[in-house]
């Protein structure tokens, strides 16, 4: 297993994995080109997407976002947020998710961030077990709200 940061050069391989996840079938070789919006997102300095490469294809990814904090309370250090973590079902339980989660720890150290945060569905027992194994603890009572 190799972990790679997703960028403009390897995005099509990443898109193949996402297409398979969403549609259950492989994408045709002549997949779509990278849109200007996607180019902008991939070059966002606060977005970090890492993918697990196995046998020439991506089988999982983690999407991390660094959100800086301002003011003396935070000393200019922000938080890393785990936006998404996914591993192909046939590769689960083999250390891929833990290795991808390690990238969050590495990024926290690299950016001198205050901490790592994530949201998890209370009914997703496999994810809860993984996050606890990675050192995460439940903190407070929070409502997840969207508009």
Predicted regions and their residues:
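Extreme N-terminal starter segment of soluble prokaryotic enzymes
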Residues: 1-2
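Acetyl-CoA-dependent GNAT
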Residues: 5-12, 16-77, 83
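A short, glycine- and basic residue-enriched loop/turn
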Residues: 79, 128, 141-142
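Residue-level recognition of the GNAT/N-acetyltransferase active site
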Residues: 83, 88, 92, 121
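Conserved acetyl-CoA-binding loop-helix of GNAT-fold acetyltransferases
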Residues: 87, 93-106, 133
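Conserved GNAT acetyl-CoA-binding A-motif
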Residues: 101, 108-119
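Conserved beta-strand-loop-alpha-helix junction that forms the acyl-donor binding cleft
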Residues: 114-127, 144-147
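Conserved acetyl-CoA-binding loop of GNAT-fold acetyltransferases
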Residues: 131-141
């Amino acid at each position: 297993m190799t972990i790679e940061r997703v960028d403009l050069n390897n995005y099509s391989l990443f898109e193949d994995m996402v297409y398979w996840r969403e549609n259950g079938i492989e994408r045709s070789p002549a997949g779509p080109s990278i849109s200007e919006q996607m180019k902008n997102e991939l070059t966002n300095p606060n977005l970090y997407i890492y993918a697990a490469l196995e046998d020439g294809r991506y089988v999982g990814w983690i999407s991390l976002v660094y959100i800086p904090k301002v003011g003396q309370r935070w000393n200019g250090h922000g938080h890393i947020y785990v936006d998404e973590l996914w591993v192909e079902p046939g590769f689960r339980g083999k250390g891929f998710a833990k290795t991808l989660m390690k990238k969050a720890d590495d990024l926290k150290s690299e950016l001198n961030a205050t901490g790592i945060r994530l949201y998890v569905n209370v009914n997703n027992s496999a994810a809860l077990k993984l996050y606890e194994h990675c050192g995460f603890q439940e903190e407070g009572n929070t409502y997840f709200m969207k508009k």
